[in-house]
C-alpha cells in the first residue's frame, strides 16, 4: 500500500506523541498479543510471560525501536528493515501471520492510550503503515 502525504503526516505526528512511551507501549502490545493469541508464545519458549516481565519489556522496546526506525524511513522501508527481515525470515522463522497479530495489538494499545488523537484517519494511516512494515518483514520468506 502506498502511503499518501497525509498518511505520512499522520504517522509521524502519532509517533511523536508516543515519544518516550514507545518501549512501554511496545511491551503492552507484546503482552496483549501473548494473552490474546497464545500460539504466538511458541516463538519465545524462554520467556517469562508474567505481567511486566523483563523479557516482555525488552522485546517491546525492540519492537518500538524498529518501528521508530521505520517511521524515520517511510520512503524506504525495505532498506530500513532489511536486517530485521533477514532475521525473522532466515533465523527466527516467525510465521508471517504473527506480524498482523502484533500490529492489531499495537493499534489497540495506541487507541487505548491516545483515544482523542486516534481518529479514523490516524487509525487508517497507522494500519497502512503497519501493513507495509509487515509486508517488508515477510518479503524475504519467498
UniProtKB/Swiss-Prot annotation:
Q: Which domain of life is it from?
A: Eukaryota
**Phosphoserine modified-residue sites:** 4, 103, 125, 139
Q: Which GO terms describe its cellular component?
A: blood microparticle; haptoglobin-hemoglobin complex; hemoglobin complex
Indicate yes or no for the key word Transferase: no
Modified-residue entries (Phosphotyrosine), positions: 25
Q: Which residues are recorded as binding heme b?
A: 88
Q: Pfam families this protein is in?
A: Globin
Q: Which SUPFAM superfamilies match?
A: Globin-like (SSF46458)
Q: Report the sequence similarity comment from the record.
A: Belongs to the globin family.
PROSITE patterns hit by this protein = GLOBIN (PS01033)
Tissue distribution: Red blood cells.
Q: Which InterPro entries match?
A: Globin, Globin-like_sf, Globin/Proto, Hemoglobin_a-typ, Hemoglobin_oxygen_transport, Hemoglobin_pi
Residues bearing Phosphothreonine?
9, 109, 135, 138
Residues the entry annotates as binding O2? 59
Q: How does this polypeptide assemble, per the annotation? A: Heterotetramer of two alpha chains and two beta chains.
Give the Globin domain ranges. 2-142
Q: Which named protein is this?
A: Hemoglobin subunit alpha-1/2
Q: Which residues does the record list as N6-acetyllysine (modified residue)?
A: 17
Q: Which residues carry this modification: N6-succinyllysine?
A: 8, 12, 17, 41
> PANTHER family this protein is in?
HEMOGLOBIN FAMILY MEMBER (PTHR11442), HEMOGLOBIN SUBUNIT ALPHA (PTHR11442:SF48)
Q: Name one GO molecular function term.
A: heme binding
Q: What does this protein do?
A: Involved in oxygen transport from the lung to the various peripheral tissues.
What keywords are annotated for this sequence in UniProt? Acetylation, Heme, Iron, Metal-binding, Oxygen transport, Phosphoprotein, Transport
Give the CDD domains listed for this entry: Hb-alpha-like (cd08927)
